Protein backbone atom coordinates (compact mmCIF):
# COMPACT_ATOMS: atom_id res chain seq x y z
CA UNK A 1 0.00 0.00 0.00
CA UNK A 2 1.35 3.43 -0.93
CA UNK A 3 1.79 5.91 1.87
CA UNK A 4 -0.16 9.10 1.30
CA UNK A 5 1.95 12.25 1.04
CA UNK A 6 -0.87 14.31 2.48
CA UNK A 7 -1.47 12.06 5.48
CA UNK A 8 1.86 12.98 7.05
CA UNK A 9 2.40 16.30 5.29
CA UNK A 10 -0.87 18.14 5.54
CA UNK A 11 0.74 21.58 5.47
CA UNK A 12 2.30 22.09 2.03
CA UNK A 13 3.54 25.55 3.04
CA UNK A 14 6.11 24.36 5.60
CA UNK A 15 9.09 23.60 3.37
CA UNK A 16 8.70 26.66 1.17
CA UNK A 17 8.16 28.99 4.10
CA UNK A 18 11.32 27.88 5.87
CA UNK A 19 13.37 28.04 2.66
CA UNK A 20 12.13 31.46 1.57
CA UNK A 21 12.37 32.98 5.06
CA UNK A 22 16.00 31.91 5.27
CA UNK A 23 16.74 33.09 1.71
CA UNK A 24 15.37 36.51 2.69
CA UNK A 25 17.60 36.52 5.79
CA UNK A 26 14.64 36.78 8.16
CA UNK A 27 14.37 35.19 11.56
CA UNK A 28 11.11 33.65 12.70
CA UNK A 29 10.76 36.58 15.10
CA UNK A 30 11.17 39.12 12.29
CA UNK A 31 8.64 37.34 10.11
CA UNK A 32 6.14 37.20 12.96
CA UNK A 33 6.65 40.91 13.68
CA UNK A 34 5.97 41.82 10.03
CA UNK A 35 2.83 39.69 10.02
CA UNK A 36 1.64 41.31 13.24
CA UNK A 37 2.03 44.74 11.63
CA UNK A 38 -0.45 43.50 9.01
CA UNK A 39 -2.88 42.45 11.72
CA UNK A 40 -2.11 38.73 11.60
CA UNK A 41 -1.97 37.22 15.09
CA UNK A 42 1.06 34.96 14.65
CA UNK A 43 4.07 34.89 16.93
CA UNK A 44 7.46 33.18 16.57
CA UNK A 45 6.15 30.04 18.24
CA UNK A 46 3.43 29.65 15.59
CA UNK A 47 5.89 30.31 12.75
CA UNK A 48 8.00 27.50 14.17
CA UNK A 49 4.98 25.18 14.32
CA UNK A 50 4.07 25.98 10.71
CA UNK A 51 7.64 25.27 9.56
CA UNK A 52 7.61 21.96 11.47
CA UNK A 53 4.30 21.01 9.84
CA UNK A 54 2.47 21.10 13.16
CA UNK A 55 0.03 23.89 12.29
CA UNK A 56 -2.12 24.60 9.27
CA UNK A 57 -1.97 27.94 7.46
CA UNK A 58 -5.22 29.81 6.96
CA UNK A 59 -5.92 31.36 3.57
CA UNK A 60 -5.45 34.95 4.75
CA UNK A 61 -2.21 33.94 6.49
CA UNK A 62 -0.95 32.48 3.21
CA UNK A 63 -1.69 35.75 1.41
CA UNK A 64 0.05 37.79 4.12
CA UNK A 65 3.07 35.46 4.22
CA UNK A 66 3.48 35.97 0.48
CA UNK A 67 3.22 39.71 0.83
CA UNK A 68 5.79 39.89 3.66
CA UNK A 69 8.19 37.57 1.84
CA UNK A 70 7.52 39.39 -1.47
CA UNK A 71 6.74 36.17 -3.34
CA UNK A 72 3.77 34.71 -5.17
CA UNK A 73 1.71 31.85 -3.80
CA UNK A 74 3.22 29.67 -6.51
CA UNK A 75 6.73 30.51 -5.29
CA UNK A 76 5.78 29.72 -1.70
CA UNK A 77 4.29 26.38 -2.79
CA UNK A 78 7.13 25.57 -5.22
CA UNK A 79 8.20 22.45 -3.31
CA UNK A 80 4.68 21.05 -3.68
CA UNK A 81 4.54 21.82 -7.41
CA UNK A 82 7.98 20.29 -7.99
CA UNK A 83 6.84 17.09 -6.29
CA UNK A 84 3.52 16.78 -8.11
CA UNK A 85 4.02 18.81 -11.27
CA UNK A 86 1.77 21.53 -12.63
Predicted segments, located by residue:
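A short, Lys/Arg-rich alpha-helix, primarily the initiator
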Residues: 1-23
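Residue-level detection of the helix-turn-helix DNA-binding "recognition helix"
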Residues: 22, 36-37, 52, 81
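Short alpha-helical DNA-recognition segment
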Residues: 25-49
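Short, charged recognition helix plus adjacent turn
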Residues: 2-7, 67, 74-86
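Helix-turn-helix DNA-binding elements, focusing on the entry/boundary residues of the two helices
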Residues: 17, 28, 44, 59-62
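DNA major-groove recognition helix of helix-turn-helix/homeodomain DNA-binding modules
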Residues: 54, 58-75
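Flexible coil/turn residues that form the inter-helical turn or adjacent wing/linker of helix-turn-helix
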Residues: 13, 24, 40, 55-58
Amino acid sequence: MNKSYFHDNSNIVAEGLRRLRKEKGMSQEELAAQLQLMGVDIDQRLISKIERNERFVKDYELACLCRVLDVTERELLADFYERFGD
